[in-house]
């Protein structure tokens, strides 16, 4: 499968919404362009897609952040998903590689990804890419 990784466009909204739904985050396609624009305006965030034969088969978002505890920036993959029909073909690895390249280019010294406890297959994938389980995360909905 020949795959191109490129920046997400507003015209990718339907495909991105569908992929987010596969990940367990039902999304209205009409919201995607608005969210992409907000992310572009804020800066430090990139959403890209994997395209094969004119079809979007994966997407990922990475953000860069600076904290008081470190001089160097760190990156965080906030979304990565490949269509069920296109998994195990190197697309997820290509998306993660693009996130790593972006983070290196802007001076990050680390990249993290958060994954729900029940996504064991995803955890194995991240370990194969060289990621290590590091800490627990706590969230309070506001």
State where each predicted segment sits:
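Residue-level recognition of the GNAT/N-acetyltransferase active site
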Residues: 65, 83, 87, 116
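Alpha-helical interaction/dimerization surfaces of two-component signaling modules
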Residues: 19-23, 102, 125, 129
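Residues at alpha-helix boundaries and the short loops/turns that link adjacent helices
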Residues: 22-26, 89, 132
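Conserved active-site alpha-helix within GNAT-family acetyltransferase domains
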Residues: 93, 105, 117-135, 140
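Acetyl-CoA-dependent GNAT
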Residues: 3, 7-72, 78, 141
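Conserved GNAT acetyl-CoA-binding A-motif
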Residues: 96, 103-115
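Conserved acetyl-CoA-binding loop-helix of GNAT-fold acetyltransferases
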Residues: 82, 88-101, 128
């Amino acid at each position: 499968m020949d795959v191109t990784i490129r920046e997400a466009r507003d015209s990718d909204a339907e495909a991105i919404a569908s992929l987010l739904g596969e990940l367990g985050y039902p999304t209205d396609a009409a919201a995607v362009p608005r969210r992409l624009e907000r992310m572009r305006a804020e800066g430090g965030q990139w959403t890209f897609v994997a395209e094969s034969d004119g079809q979007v088969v994966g997407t990922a978002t990475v953000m860069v952040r600076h904290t008081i505890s470190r001089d160097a920036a760190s990156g965080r993959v906030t979304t990565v998903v490949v269509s069920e029909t296109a998994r195990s073909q190197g697309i997820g690895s290509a998306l993660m590689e693009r996130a790593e390249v972006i983070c290196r280019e802007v001076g990050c010294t680390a990249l993290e990804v958060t994954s729900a406890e029940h996504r064991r297959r995803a955890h194995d994938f991240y370990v194969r890419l060289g990621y290590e389980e590091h800490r627990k995360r706590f969230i309070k909905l506001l």
